[in-house]
Amino acid sequence: MENWAVQSPEEPGFHAVVTPDKSSCKEAWIYRLNLNKGDSHTLKSGRLEMHPVLCEGAAVLSGNSALEGVRLEKYDSFYIPGETDVIITAQEDCFFYVAAAVCEGYGEIFVRKFDPSLPIGDIHQIHGEGTGRREVMFTLAPQDKASRLLCGFTWGGEGTWTSWPPHQHEADLEEVYCYFDMPKPHFGFHISYLKSADVEEVMAHHMRARARRRPKHGGRPSRCLPCNRSPFR
């Protein structure tokens, strides 16, 4: 469990953060794209489906007829299936987390604009109660046309749990948590354990803006320090 946390790079460029050949994950890839204002990057999906989510800044898309001229602002996202290219140009300094998985030939390009006013339903959801209450906003929902990926944002309250009680999805999901919006001195803890309902042996990882991977076993409550929120996607 010691190596389950990975610091995502902050320098400009397109960076592989979690990949099956270098982690315990077998199905999931996570990339981070950092662009300075005015810089561009051509995203090429190849054999993967990709889901970039803008966590900071603003950008515009080009080079693909289905996405031409689309402007992205904070928390907006889009999806591309395999063998698809798109140019991302930063209108402000920005960074994306990019989730990816093997494309099985199923998936359609789409853009999802972040809308916090959406009613509770398929995209906007509330889970848990009390200090375990959390708000979920899907960026790539179960009903969307994609091969393997499910993605979304989760926000907890200030100083509360964002995943409580401890639970896991090892029967059918491999999960990666990408933390954001926690600049210094803000931080939280991601607590990992291997055996269901056995929390005697746990590992706590310090979290700011980094990725935390988890294979198909173990659990993961996460906790934010007082006066902080612990958002992840």
Regions found by a protein language model. Give the residues of each.
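Short histidine-centered beta-strand/loop micro-motifs
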Residues: H41-G46, S163-H169, H205, R223-L225
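Extended, compositionally biased flexible segments
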Residues: K22, W29-V98
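A short glycine-rich, His/Asp/Glu-containing loop-to-beta-strand
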Residues: P9-S40, E129-Y177
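A short beta-strand-loop micro-motif that forms or neighbors metal/cofactor-
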Residues: Y177-F180, C224-R233
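Conserved metal-binding segment of the jelly-roll/cupin
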Residues: L72-Q91, A99-A101, A204-R229
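Non-transmembrane, aqueous-exposed alpha-helical and coiled segments at domain scale
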Residues: E2-E10
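Hydrophobic alpha-helical segments and helix pairs
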Residues: E73-G130
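Glycine- and acidic-residue-biased ligand/ion/polar-headgroup-sensing regions
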Residues: G46-S65, A171-A209
